[in-house]
Amino acid sequence: MSTTKALSLLVFILFVSLVHSSDQCPINSIYQFGDSISDTGNLIRNGPASSPTPKPLPQREHNVFVNFGVSGSTALNSSFFSERNLHVPATNTPLSMQLAWFKGHLRSTCHGSSSDCLKHSLFMVGEIGGNDYNYGFFQGKPMEEIRSYIPHVVGAITAAAREVIRAGAVNVVVPGNFPVGCFPIYLTSFPVKDTKDYDDNGCLTHLNEFAMDHNNQLQEAIASLRKEFPDVAIVYGDYYNAFQYVLRSERFDKSVALKSCCGTGGAYNYDGKRPYGAVGVPVCQNPHKFISWDGVHLTQKAYRFMSKFLNNQILSQIKCTRA
């Protein structure tokens, strides 16, 4: 776990918006669970050369950012994948472990009731779950088998949200999945010959439909959570439509909308055998034109535009507690 001034850019921009609205709705801390979308160094810190259970870094007196997200992590425990003959890396830090870190952090820093400590906090439970499906897709599992994972993944995410609520959280954002059929890594790895299998933006329809299936089931689970905890603001983070908003924006170069900024080769400037950071792979010189940074993650500009879409949605639903 790392405590840092900047989580993902997406979360950081959201925090700035909350600070600016602090007169109406004071938020003094953000707790982030997730994967590489939010990881700012936990994978390295939690690697073979480090302690397997990192200790919390000291908090600042105000405006606390605590990030439990680890690159490559899953919503489900590793045993789920081993039972299905899927390999996941030893560094996998599933939601259950991230929650254990959170509980340890809370015990070491909260000297009153956890409800009092968390009443001015915002919890981001995700984005997570994409890797649960990735391990199936990229290890050759059929679509219908991977689709059967969705209820399990959604169950793990909602169980995590339930745990932080029981700990005292009153503002919880649960993001959905991206339209992964628009990402260079998927467009390159799973090409199809029939142009009817691509939408008007050039994205793979069947993969976007899969993401929507996950998102629909997640929203149904969130609706149930709201009935279970009527006094808690549980907000669905619509990353799918936030990305589509970016894709439609005139502020990006349409000719490279589906291409990786840092990469090489192929129609989407992405080669899984020579990813960003590999020897000979050029660094992008004009990231302001691109949506995708490395074929998997987005550019800072894209995240900034996503945040514009998300901020009003989230800010209008969070629970304000001044006492």
UniProtKB/Swiss-Prot annotation:
Protein name stated in the entry: GDSL esterase/lipase At5g03980
Residues of the signal peptide: 1-21
PANTHER family reported in the protein's UniProt record: ACETYLAJMALAN ESTERASE-LIKE (PTHR22835:SF677), ZINC FINGER FYVE DOMAIN CONTAINING PROTEIN (PTHR22835)
Any one GO MF annotation of this record: hydrolase activity, acting on ester bonds
Any Pfam family hit: Lipase_GDSL
Record's keyword terms, sorted: Glycoprotein, Hydrolase, Lipid degradation, Lipid metabolism, Secreted, Signal
Family: Belongs to the 'GDSL' lipolytic enzyme family.
UniProt-listed GO biological process terms: lipid catabolic process
Main location: secreted
Enzyme active site: 36 (nucleophile), 294, 297
Keyword Glycoprotein applies: yes
Annotated source species: Arabidopsis thaliana (Mouse-ear cress)
Residues bearing glycans: 77
UniProt GO cellular component terms: extracellular region
Entry annotated with the keyword Ribonucleoprotein: no
SUPFAM superfamilies linked: SGNH hydrolase
EC numbers: 3.1.1.-
InterPro entries: GDSL, SGNH_hydro_sf
Superkingdom of origin: Eukaryota
Localization, UniProt: Secreted
